[in-house]
């Protein structure tokens, strides 16, 4: 079992990053010449429980560690994440990163403060995969869907 302090830390990073990207929090914007970071998830649709997907990021901060995880919008402005399957990756010198992540059709969701939300069902909730650094910065989350 993962200690609750680790759950709080990891969920907070991914949740804050996802919320900031979706306009729910204000973040520092880099100069206009810098491209916004992007993320891709392959495959992202027609998934089965336990599918291992490839998560890639570009335009990231070189040398920065990112947590990668699955989250869902469970209520207006409320994001619950699955810390049990989180992974980490560090962006290379070009600002690119790639890792694998196991995604779940349903999972025990935790809020950014570590509060247990309850069971999240990705066949009814808007689930996504996201990347976030320690400050909560990262590309927009990528929507995923299950069979």
From Swiss-Prot:
S-S bonds: 71-81, 122-127
UniProt-listed GO biological process terms: defense response to bacterium
Molecular function (Gene Ontology), one example: DNA binding
UniProt keyword terms in alphabetical order: Antibiotic, Antimicrobial, Disulfide bond, DNA-binding, Signal
Signal peptide (UniProt feature, chain positions): 1-34
Pfam families membership: Neocarzinostat
Biological function: NCS has antibiotic activity (for Gram-positive bacteria) and antitumor activity (for certain mouse tumors). NCS binds non-covalently to a chromophore which is the cytotoxic and mutagenic component of the antibiotic. The chromophore binds to DNA as a weak intercalator and causes single- and double-strand breaks.
Sequence similarity: Belongs to the neocarzinostatin family.
The protein, known as: Neocarzinostatin
Gene that specifies this protein: ncsA
């Amino acid at each position: 079992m993962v200690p609750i302090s680790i759950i709080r830390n990891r969920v907070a990073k991914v949740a804050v990053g996802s919320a900031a990207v979706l306009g729910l929090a204000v973040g520092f914007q880099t100069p206009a010449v810098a491209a916004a970071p992007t993320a891709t998830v392959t495959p992202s649709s027609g998934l089965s429980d336990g599918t291992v997907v490839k998560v890639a990021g570009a335009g990231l901060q070189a040398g920065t560690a990112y947590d990668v995880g699955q989250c869902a919008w469970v209520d207006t402005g409320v994001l619950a994440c699955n810390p049990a399957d989180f992974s980490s990756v560090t962006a290379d010198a070009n600002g690119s990163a790639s890792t694998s992540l196991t995604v779940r059709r349903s999972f025990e969701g935790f809020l950014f403060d570590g509060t247990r939300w309850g069971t999240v069902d990705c066949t009814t909730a808007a689930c996504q995969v996201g990347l976030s650094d320690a400050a909560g910065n990262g590309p927009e989350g990528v929507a995923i869907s299950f069979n």
